[in-house]
Amino acid sequence: MSEMTPREIVHELDAHIIGQKKAKRSVAVALRNRWRRMQLDADFRQEVTPKNILMIGPTGVGKTEIARRLAKLANAPFIKVEATKFTEVGYVGKEVEQIIRDLTDIAIKLTREQQMGKCRQRAEEHAEERILDALLPKPKNDWDDSDSNSNTRQIFRKKLRESQLDDKEIDIDVAQPQIGIEIMSPPGMEEMTNQLQSLFKNMGQAPAKRRKMKIKEAFKLLIEEEAAKLVNQEDLKEQAIELVEQNGIVFLDEIDKICKRGETSGPDVSREGVQRDLLPLVEGCTVTTKHGMVKTDHILFIASGAFQMSKPSDLIPELQGRLPIRVELDALTADDFKRILTEPHASLTEQYIALMATEGVIIEFTESGIESIAKAAWQVNERTENIGARRLHTVMEKLMEDISYEASDKSGSSFVIDADYVSAHLDNLVQDEDLSRFIL
């Protein structure tokens, strides 16, 4: 789990996301509270439940980007899902409990990597011995000179560690990768499907196969194989489930798309039905997975939505009550667009400069040019559909279209993107109401 303070988390998010201080502070505090809770006594810890968050803001202002960056900072099981992908229990489609099953799979992978990292040194030693056995087979006769053989082994061990034998080929027994069998499961029978897949998986274990490969490649494969042998699978599952239950984070995107709109007749299986199914998950229930039973009482849920066609109050009251922290994200201004073009790590302007440099073309964005690009994107957003920062991608692509097309023929050339260049390439499209609609 991440031990970063809220200030450090916000600082990391600032490197990639412009503005939205309230949202950053809320997710930073929520992430820190996960760490704080784990410092409490076990009995008291069970009484502290996470305060789930609802992020509200127009499209393209950074809701999903906050989730992506948070996943890298969390160092805990984290899953981002779209609420629109699920249907009510009993109908064709994915059930919401699949979220917890997928989160548990992520925790298994995370825990396995951590455990394999801890026993990597032992795995390297075992892999080294197996390679030396392939290079110097053990003598079949008991009267062979063991001292001489041991000295030779040490000489080869030294060469192996100094990478002098990397390109030498050897024959070695390597475990065969298991062939996965995908079974389509009917709704409500996912657990039975998982058991069948496990059965086929165990039946299909192939014996090790002798392969000829270079020592460098063989060493990597053998380290992974030996590390996997050293990991206790039962302990792995227990630790992963504990990790999910105590530190798991679920990011529910597009939650506004499952709000009920107007009066409709008949069952609403992909909207209000999904909300009802989400209630026990958010409140706390037990979900059956192929790795064991997972309790969701202390999993943190962060929901987000644009709410352009609906309002947060359109969510069913029970779900509203389970998302107590509300954060409103601000619409982006022309100044925000200017900062987005220059301040974040690997900003759009830096990306185009780097891409064109591969062709030997030098691109320079002036201050006036960046201001003009930001203003053009903001104007198109105001006149047509406001899609936030995503507008910058299409405006920049249109602006750089000619240079990108001719770059391979103009190696050594330089281009200055100033206000005049931007005006010449974008003014007609921005000013023409009909054409500006085609700049998606």
Swiss-Prot record:
CDD domains: RecA-like_HslU. Keywords: ATP-binding, Chaperone, Cytoplasm, Nucleotide-binding. GO terms for molecular function: ATP binding; ATP hydrolysis activity; peptidase activity; proteasome-activating activity. GO terms for biological process: protein unfolding; proteolysis involved in protein catabolic process. SUPFAM superfamilies: P-loop containing nucleoside triphosphate hydrolases. ATP binds at I18, G60, V61, G62, K63, T64, E65, D253, E318, R390. It is found in: Cytoplasm. Gene3D superfamilies: 1.10.8.60, DNA helicase RuvA subunit, C-terminal domain (1.10.8.10), P-loop containing nucleotide triphosphate hydrolases (3.40.50.300). GO terms for cellular component: HslUV protease complex. It holds the Pfam family AAA_2. InterPro entries: AAA+_ATPase, ATP-dep_Clp_protease_ClpX, ATPase_AAA_core, Clp_ATPase_C, HslU, P-loop_NTPase. A double ring-shaped homohexamer of HslV is capped on each side by a ring-shaped HslU homohexamer. The assembly of the HslU/HslV complex is dependent on binding of ATP. NCBIfam families: hslU, PRK05201.1. PANTHER family: ATP-DEPENDENT CLP PROTEASE ATP-BINDING SUBUNIT CLPX-LIKE, MITOCHONDRIAL-RELATED, ATP-DEPENDENT PROTEASE ATPASE SUBUNIT HSLU. Belongs to the ClpX chaperone family. HslU subfamily. ATPase subunit of a proteasome-like degradation complex; this subunit has chaperone activity. The binding of ATP and its subsequent hydrolysis by HslU are essential for unfolding of protein substrates subsequently hydrolyzed by HslV. HslU recognizes the N-terminal part of its protein substrates and unfolds these before they are guided to HslV for hydrolysis. This is ATP-dependent protease ATPase subunit HslU.
